[in-house]
Each structure stands twice: as C-alpha cells, then as structure tokens.
Amino acid sequence: MMLNMLAKGQSAVITAINASKELKSRFNSFGIVKGAIVNVEQYSLAKQTMEIKINKTRMALRFSEAEQVEISE
C-alpha cells in the first residue's frame, strides 16, 4: 500500500521508499525513513498535497511523492 492511499487520521509504518537518490535524501532529512510511523493529518482541497506527521514534525508532500512511499498499517 502506498502513503497517498491512507485516509485522514490514519497511521502506518513506512516499509520502503521507491524514489530517486535525491528524493530519498530529501525524505531522510525530514525523517521519512523505513520504520518511521507516519500519520496523515489532512489533504488539500484538490487532493494534490497531503500533510503528514512523523514524530513531532509536520510536513506537506505532493501526491506524486507520497506514491513512492510504501507503508503497512
């Protein structure tokens, strides 16, 4: 299952990141790494971005980026 499929308020564990080296590096700097617990806080009106929370850090991801993050509930 991919991160962009989670509903608002749901949590899951990141199991893999299928992204370019540059995007993986960016994700790593935000704490988006294998084993991290991610919570979906909200979606934008057009559902082009989503706000997620990992630990105490909130961030916005494009749907295209969230499609590259595999999760397990």
Task: Enumerate the language-model features and the residues they cover.
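Absolute protein N-terminus
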Residues: M1-M2, E73
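C-terminal structural segments of small proteins and small subunits
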Residues: Q42-E73
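Short alpha-helix capping/helix-loop boundary micro-motifs
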Residues: L23-R26
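Conserved hydrophobic positions within beta-strands
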Residues: I14, I37-V40
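Residue-level recognition of beta-strand microenvironments
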Residues: I17, F30, E41-Y43
